């Protein structure tokens, strides 16, 4: 990995890289990714779990016991459960969402995929998602994974971030451009 990817730098990048290498050796990359995606969804759905993970108020012992109970109840095992327990023991559980993001980036790079961060004003239907994926694939020549975020403040259009490139065709940006042009003219 000669090229440094900003999405896998820092503490979270080191943990993600270690987990990725371990999963690659075990030939369990897809299983670990699925587990991490599920854990990420659990964090999004449970404010209590998110608080346990992110709050420094909980002691290491309390955090470890609570996480072990959550992992057991949710049916996590193997590499992912051990990894999350290591994060907890090292007092780095607060960084788990960044670790998951970095792990996803490593998996995408390994599979030759490119992840596009797409911001839209309203949820896109499958037809529009497929059309966007096809258009981006024709530009990059690689498989595309879309991470879609809905942000009504862009009013309309979309913002696409693909690596270091960004295309902002949002209505908000166009209106701001017109507003600035009118201020300069008048």
From Swiss-Prot:
Q: Which SUPFAM superfamilies match?
A: N-terminal domain of the delta subunit of the F1F0-ATP synthase
Q: Name one Pfam family in it.
A: OSCP
User: Record's InterPro entries?
Assistant: ATP_synth_OSCP/delta_N_sf (IPR026015), ATPase_OSCP/d_CS (IPR020781), ATPase_OSCP/dsu (IPR000711)
What do the Gene Ontology cellular component annotations say? Answer: plasma membrane; proton-transporting ATP synthase complex
Location (main, coarse)? membrane
Alphabetical keyword list: ATP synthesis, Cell inner membrane, Cell membrane, CF(1), Hydrogen ion transport, Ion transport, Membrane, Transport
Q: Which family does it belong to?
A: Belongs to the ATPase delta chain family.
What's the protein called, per UniProt? ATP synthase subunit delta
Gene it is expressed from: atpH
């Amino acid at each position: 990995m000669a090229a440094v990817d900003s999405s896998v730098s820092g503490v979270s990048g080191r943990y993600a890289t270690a987990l990725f290498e371990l999963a690659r050796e075990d030939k369990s990359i897809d299983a670990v990714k699925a587990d991490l995606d599920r854990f990420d969804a659990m964090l999004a759905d449970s404010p209590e779990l998110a608080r346990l993970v992110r709050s420094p108020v909980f002691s290491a012992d309390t955090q470890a016991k609570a996480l072990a109970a959550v992992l057991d109840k949710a049916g996590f095992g193997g590499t992912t459960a051990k990894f999350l327990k290591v994060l907890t023991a090292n007092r780095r559980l607060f960084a788990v969402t960044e670790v998951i993001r970095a792990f996803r980036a490593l998996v995408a790079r390994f599979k030759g995929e490119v992840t596009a961060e797409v911001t839209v004003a309203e949820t896109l239907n499958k037809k529009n998602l497929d059309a966007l994926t096809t258009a981006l694939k024709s530009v990059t020549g690689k498989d595309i994974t879309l991470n879609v975020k809905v942000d009504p403040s862009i009013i309309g259009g979309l913002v696409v971030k693909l690596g270091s490139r960004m295309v902002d065709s949002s209505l908000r940006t166009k209106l701001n451009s017109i507003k600035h042009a009118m201020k300069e003219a008048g």
